[in-house]
Amino acid sequence: EYKENFRTLSNAALSGGVTSVVSMPNTSPVIDNVSMVDFIVRRGRDKAGINIYPSATLTRNMDGKLMTEFGLLSKKGIIGFTDATKTIQNAEMMSRIMDYASDIDVLVMQHPEDHELSKDRCISEGEISTRLGLRGIPYIAEKIIIERDLSLLEEYPCRYHISQLSSSKSVEV
């Protein structure tokens, strides 16, 4: 709660006319187990003046290696699974995630960004990055992951949401 707590979140949301939010799991500690989900649900109910819909991580500790327990967590009120701004880089892991998500009908949310193409960069490639003298993240870093995931969805159809797009070219995919 050092960056934000349920009261500050509620106040900000309500001042903008928002009555419901999805909480992201990239907290400290991350939301990747039943006890953390229970805590978030209970705290949201008791402290927030808005509806809090929690999400949990796709992988334990958001490290991209071991899937969290989708079945158990979804029964506790999780509305979707995401590793927040950490993209699942490994196609085999993503295929297993999608396969399991399809079986139990849970939402997978993915931030599309190829790590190798975005490493050590902090801004989209373009006029502003050039003017500031910064190495930009090329749009292809986003497109590669989107194309990969859309291909995987053909084999493992699940509910899937692409989060935080930064390029209009990605929408065209």
Predicted features by range, described:
Residues 34-55, 99-110:
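Alpha-helix-loop-beta-strand connector modules within alpha/beta enzyme cores
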Residues 1-4, 25-27, 53-66, 85, ...:
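Active-site mouth loops of central-metabolism enzymes
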